[in-house]
A protein has these predicted regions:
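Histidine- and acidic-residue-rich, metal-dependent catalytic cores
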Residues: 1-16
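Divalent metal-dependent phosphate-bond-processing catalytic cores, especially two-metal-ion Mg2+/Mn2+ enzymes
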Residues: 13-111
Length: 111
């Protein structure tokens, strides 16, 4: 169960995912190809066409952006230390991202 959790939780954190078990590395790498095109050049063109024919992207970029921006709007505190912050800054009007320096400064301690 821990392996599955790690693969899901770390798939957007290459600085950690690439140093974990092979399954975690593969989940991260597969998602990186699918979402960002990282490593796409290592897949032959005929294979790419076959894959995209079987699994069309169906406006993936637009839909993905919309989903992430909805999370930013509904749960802005979940944007600390992940890709949601970037989408909020770029696409969500009025988004004021949580900032770690502010979190420390506003911690409930007297000193």
């Amino acid at each position: 169960m821990q392996l599955v959790w790690d693969a899901i939780a770390l798939h957007t954190t290459p600085t950690l995912a690439l140093h974990k078990e092979p399954e975690v590395v593969m989940v991260h790498s597969g998602i990186a190809v699918d979402v960002l095109g990282v490593g796409l050049d290592r897949i032959p063109q005929d294979k790419q066409r076959a894959i995209l024919s079987e699994f069309p992207r169906l406006a993936f970029k637009t839909q993905f952006k919309g989903c992430l921006c909805n999370v930013v709007r509904q749960k802005p505190m979940t944007t600390v230390d992940n890709i949601l912050r970037d989408f909020g800054i770029r696409y969500v009007e009025g988004f004021a991202p949580p900032n770690f320096a502010d979190l420390v400064a506003n911690a409930p301690f007297s000193e």
